[in-house]
Amino acid sequence: MKLDFTRKNAIPKKYFIGIKSIKMQTFGWRLLDLDGFSLMTFWAQYGEFIKLALIFVAIIILLKFKIPLSGAIGIGAVLTVALYGIPVLDSLMIAGKSMISEATIMVLLNCYLITFLQRMMELRGHLDLAQRSLSRLFNSRRVNASIAPVFIGLLPSPGAIFIAGSMVDTACGDYISKEDKTFVASYFRHIPESFLPTYSSIILACQLTGVQMGAFVLGMVPMVACLMLLGYLFYLRKVPKETGEAASTDKLADLQSLCRSLWTIAVIILLIVVLNVPVYIATVGVIIVYFFTSRFTWQEIKLFFLSALEARIVINTFVVMIFKDLLTHTNVITALPGLFEALPIPSFLVFGLIFFVGTIVAGSTAIITLCLPMAFAAVSGAGMPLMVFLMSCTYAAMQISPTHLCLTLACEHFKTDFGALVKRTLPVIGIFYVILTGYYILLNLFF
């Protein structure tokens, strides 16, 4: 059929529809492939990380709507299974193994024992005595709310947050909100975790890199001071310094009272650090000695066997551990270097991002094991400065990670929202990262 294109409506409708279809298809392909950009290629390269982002955004939104943390993370676990296509049977097996794994059992056991010890100390008034002794020694609520959690933080157990939280609650009173108290207790309790060799992550990092433990601890001292200062400037200065108690007239007697009130914690720490005794064995031993030295009776402590086992803590522990193991199963953490390597920034910052994101997703141990040797091989002149930088990145990321069980326990202790804790922590670690970057550059000038 011959067509006259000069006449209006000369093209039959069926040809017009065909031409329109071709145009739409062409337009569609231009959307998919515009100047070399392909959505298919983009999804292949970044799809796994988009899924990860969606999971964490969903958790944040759920927390915003006051969904309990266990429920929000539980839904996050379900989304992980759905988005990453983990077979249902496999996901159930992962969940089951996670619930009965040695790591989960040890966390629950240590939390139970520390809570049991806390109940005993409260019954004998030793936590209150520690507060009064600190108040008389320093006459400062701010010292009580910061130094006490740091000391308790020497104990490498998630359950230590309960004792730290109790002391912060008493020291801060009604001068700050319970959300602020949650931050103060969690933040200062975790500062020792950033540099002390009582924590397995520090030991593992030194073993993998060959950096001397003493050199690392010395290199971390300025950053520890920075953490203390930032915590004070953001929140502790809201608390009045004065305790309302008379200044000490006998410092030695007050120091003895402090030692008498906290000797149980000190002995557990010494057993762990000096003799390498497992936390649960050290705690059981101290509880037995404490029972006799403080003349407890069976009637006094028998209720603690049940009250120290709190259902919500058990549930939260199971949910967090399952979520972390499901994320680890996706292997998304192993693809992080490919995501950040093309960024136009120095290599140490690339690995800083990898460690930050990887720690939020899978925790410190996983990212240290997988990526620390890679970082030391890729960054020229790697040594103590790089380890200080990367371990600080890991530490800071743990303070906002939903896979960090201690944060969950802190929120449970104060009955606060996890999102509120993250909101208060982000500005602090943001400034910490800026200072840390400058400190790394400075260290490289001398080491």
PLM regions: where:
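Hydrophobic alpha-helical transmembrane segments of multi-pass integral membrane proteins
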Residues: N110-L113, S135-M167, L343-Y395
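Flexible interhelical linker loops that connect adjacent transmembrane helices
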Residues: R237-L262, W298-S307
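Alpha-helical membrane segments and immediately flanking helix-loop junctions
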Residues: V143-L208, G383-A420
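Small-residue-rich segments of transmembrane alpha-helices in multi-pass membrane proteins
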Residues: V78-V88, R142-I147, L252-S261, E310-F323, ...
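Hydrophobic transmembrane alpha-helices of multi-pass solute/ion transporters
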Residues: L34-F116, L129-S133, I265-P344
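Short helix-coil transition sites and intra-membrane helix breaks within transmembrane domains
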Residues: P68, M106, Q118-G125, G153-A164, ...
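C-terminal transmembrane helix pair
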Residues: S201, F216-L229, T359-L370, F376-F447
